[in-house]
C-alpha cells in the first residue's frame, strides 16, 4: 500500500496527511485554519492584480446603474 500524500500546513508548517478523513486539510487543525482565515480578514493576504485593473473596477467612466 502506498503512503498517503503529505503536505505542510500553510500556517505552522506541520506535516498534514492529505486524506478524505482530514477535514482541515491543507491545515493541521481548526486553530491553524482560523488563524489563516483571520489573516485574510485582516487583509494580510491578497490576490495580486495588475495595477491598472483595479483602476478599471473603480472607474467613474462607467455608466451609472439604475
UniProtKB/Swiss-Prot annotation:
Alphabetical list of InterPro entries matching this protein: DNA_gyrase_inhibitor_YacG, Znf_NHR/GATA
Listed SUPFAM superfamilies: Glucocorticoid receptor-like (DNA-binding domain)
Xref: Gene3D superfamilies: Erythroid Transcription Factor GATA-1, subunit A
Pfam family, one: YacG
UniProt keyword Metal-binding present: yes
Alphabetized UniProt keyword annotations: Metal-binding, Zinc
Record text on cofactor binding: Binds 1 zinc ion.
Gene Ontology process terms (BP): regulation of DNA-templated transcription
Cofactor: Zn(2+)
Entry GO MF terms: DNA topoisomerase type II (double strand cut, ATP-hydrolyzing) inhibitor activity; zinc ion binding
Binding site for Zn(2+): 9, 12, 28, 32
NCBIfam families from the UniProt entry: PRK00418.1
Subunit organization: Interacts with GyrB.
Function of the protein: Inhibits all the catalytic activities of DNA gyrase by preventing its interaction with DNA. Acts by binding directly to the C-terminal domain of GyrB, which probably disrupts DNA binding by the gyrase.
Family, as annotated: Belongs to the DNA gyrase inhibitor YacG family.
Cited HAMAP family: DNA_gyrase_inhibitor_YacG (MF_00649)
Protein's recorded name: DNA gyrase inhibitor YacG
Origin species: Pseudomonas fluorescens (strain SBW25)
Gene: yacG
Amino acid at each position: 500500500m502506498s503512503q498517503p500524500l503529505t503536505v505542510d500546513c500553510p500556517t505552522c508548517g506541520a506535516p498534514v496527511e492529505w486524506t478524505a478523513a482530514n477535514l482541515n486539510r491543507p491545515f493541521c487543525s481548526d486553530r491553524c485554519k482560523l488563524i489563516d482565515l483571520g489573516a485574510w480578514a485582516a487583509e494580510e493576504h491578497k490576490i495580486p492584480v495588475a495595477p491598472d485593473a483595479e483602476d478599471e473596477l473603480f472607474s467613474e467612466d462607467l455608466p451609472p446603474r439604475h
